[in-house]
């Protein structure tokens, strides 16, 4: 069942997460870019308003992250600290707390957002459902606005929503794989049952897949690798931004219902006889 879309896509069709309003439904990342300058150009051309930052990499000044905090205009871009690299709930909670302090250093005193990642498997990078739920419950109790990265599991998504998460973020396919929406059927179930925004995260490789996610009724997408590893990252960022607008507009317009049989678009009455 496809969720009922808004009647029209008006100026007020903004995305609200944790009480904060976003015009853009594309979120981007900060990793894998060939240079800081390319990252800056890509963020600008994407027109995104929220960017995720790997707290552990910034804290350790990992390769490609030196100068990151100074490279982004945090008066315009909302920081989404993430717990990438954490393998269990305890680690994720500690890193989330560091992320909150990082946001404060960027001048965002009221930023409680965290993209929660608990990933014990370094090969496939699939999230741990039990650890994610445990960490989410703790972080919600501490006042965080939790955006959990999960497998496309409708039951887990509902448990996280019930725990107080501000969104759920099901993966389309494994991180960085570019395989697209391999889990479209389960994502559709999550969208149908969710009372919080659904953000498709991971696996999107091309703009058409971002558009597809929005056409399905997802509220937003998070795209990093497909932009950062493109031949022209800034151009791909712009294309992703346009695709998200197109997908959301199409969803709001309402798709043609699927039919078992053909239906002629030309009139069948009043035909000129031969």
UniProtKB/Swiss-Prot annotation:
Nucleotide-binding is among the record's keywords: no
EC number: 2.8.1.10
Pathway annotation: Cofactor biosynthesis; thiamine diphosphate biosynthesis
Reaction(s) the record says it catalyses: [ThiS sulfur-carrier protein]-C-terminal-Gly-aminoethanethioate + 2-iminoacetate + 1-deoxy-D-xylulose 5-phosphate = [ThiS sulfur-carrier protein]-C-terminal Gly-Gly + 2-[(2R,5Z)-2-carboxy-4-methylthiazol-5(2H)-ylidene]ethyl phosphate + 2 H2O + H(+)
Entry keywords, A to Z: Cytoplasm, Schiff base, Thiamine biosynthesis, Transferase
Gene Ontology molecular function, alphabetical: thiazole synthase activity
Active site: 115
InterPro entries reported for this sequence: Aldolase_TIM, Thiazole_synthase_ThiG, ThiG
Stored Pfam families: ThiG (PF05690)
Residues that coordinate or bind 1-deoxy-D-xylulose 5-phosphate: 176, 202-203, 224-225
PANTHER family noted in UniProt: THIAZOLE SYNTHASE
Family of the protein in this entry: Belongs to the ThiG family.
Oligomer and partners: Homotetramer. Forms heterodimers with either ThiH or ThiS.
Official protein name in the record: Thiazole synthase
Species of provenance: Parasynechococcus marenigrum (strain WH8102)
């Amino acid at each position: 069942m496809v969720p009922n879309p808004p009647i029209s896509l008006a100026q007020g069709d903004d995305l609200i997460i944790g009480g904060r309003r976003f015009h853009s439904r594309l979120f981007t990342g900060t990793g894998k870019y060939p240079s800081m300058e390319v990252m800056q150009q890509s963020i600008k051309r994407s027109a995104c308003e929220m960017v995720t930052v790997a707290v552990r990499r910034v804290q350790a000044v990992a390769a490609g992250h030196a100068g990151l905090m100074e490279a982004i205009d945090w008066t315009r871009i909302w920081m989404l600290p993430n717990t990438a690299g954490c393998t269990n709930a305890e680690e994720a909670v500690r890193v989330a707390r560091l992320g909150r302090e990082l946001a404060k250093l960027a001048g965002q005193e009221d930023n409680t957002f965290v993209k929660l990642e608990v990933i014990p498997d370094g090969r496939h990078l699939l999230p741990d459902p039990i650890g994610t739920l445990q960490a989410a419950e703790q972080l919600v109790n501490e006042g965080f606005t939790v955006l959990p990265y999960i497998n496309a599991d409708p039951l887990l998504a509902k448990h996280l929503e019930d725990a107080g998460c501000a969104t759920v973020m099901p993966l389309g396919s494994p991180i960085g794989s570019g395989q697209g929406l391999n889990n479209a059927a389960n994502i559709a179930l999550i969208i149908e049952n969710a009372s919080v925004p659904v953000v498709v995260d991971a696996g999107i490789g091309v703009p058409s897949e971002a558009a597809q996610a929005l056409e399905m009724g997802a509220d937003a997408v998070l795209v990093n690798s497909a932009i950062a590893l493109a031949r022209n990252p800034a151009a791909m960022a712009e294309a992703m931004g346009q695709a998200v607008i197109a997908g959301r507009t199409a969803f709001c317009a309402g798709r043609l219902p699927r039919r078992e049989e053909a239906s002629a678009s030309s009139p069948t009455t009043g035909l000129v006889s031969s």
